[in-house]
């Protein structure tokens, strides 16, 4: 075989590998806040619940969830959630209307530029500012039109990372550290910390500041309840679509009650 033919074959093979890699890895979606207006609600996110505004942190524009302001204005959260849900999904949804009454204690903001996330990574930097009842910062994902969702969050008061599911108006933990395994976690609230979710089919992994904290397989059978009692029926995958693979839904930011946190560098890296 001639050398030129060998080179041609090698180039074709390399091109095929490159094309394959391109097909597997889609373009990253990096949230750019540079054109957002400080003091206003973010344009790139749809605040479904809670008080979300653009703030200034040194040289950077950031997203701020103001838990104190939200706590003081809990008279209209359901109406706000329904109005914003109609913007995203186009129609009224009776299931969402029922669920909206239940998730008023969880401020959430949905990213507008990602219609559906199934595989890949989602990462964000967060800084905890304050909170009397809670100090939570999280990545929202698998958001369904009926208001069901999954979230991975760091709680600055418990010093742990937990994966939660929200279904039929009720939030339950899918996996959390055991009492004897509570993490030390980052105590320095003046610094930014990195939270990263990796989704590979049914496999979920959560990293905090570069250290893996949780691994979970969607569709897994739940552990028995306390004292060997049967598990909650909603934690059985056959009864609960949001905990069955594959992941498929919108993504965003999550908080809880009176938590006040800052977020920046939100990046979605899809993988097909």
Indicate residue ranges for each PLM-predicted region.
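Bacterial N-terminal signal peptides that target proteins for export
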Residues: 1-13, 17-20
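Short tryptophan-centered beta-strand motifs in secreted/extracellular beta-sheet-rich domains
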Residues: 33, 122-124, 187-208
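Short, aromatic/His-centered strand-loop micro-motif at the edge of beta-sheets
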Residues: 169-196
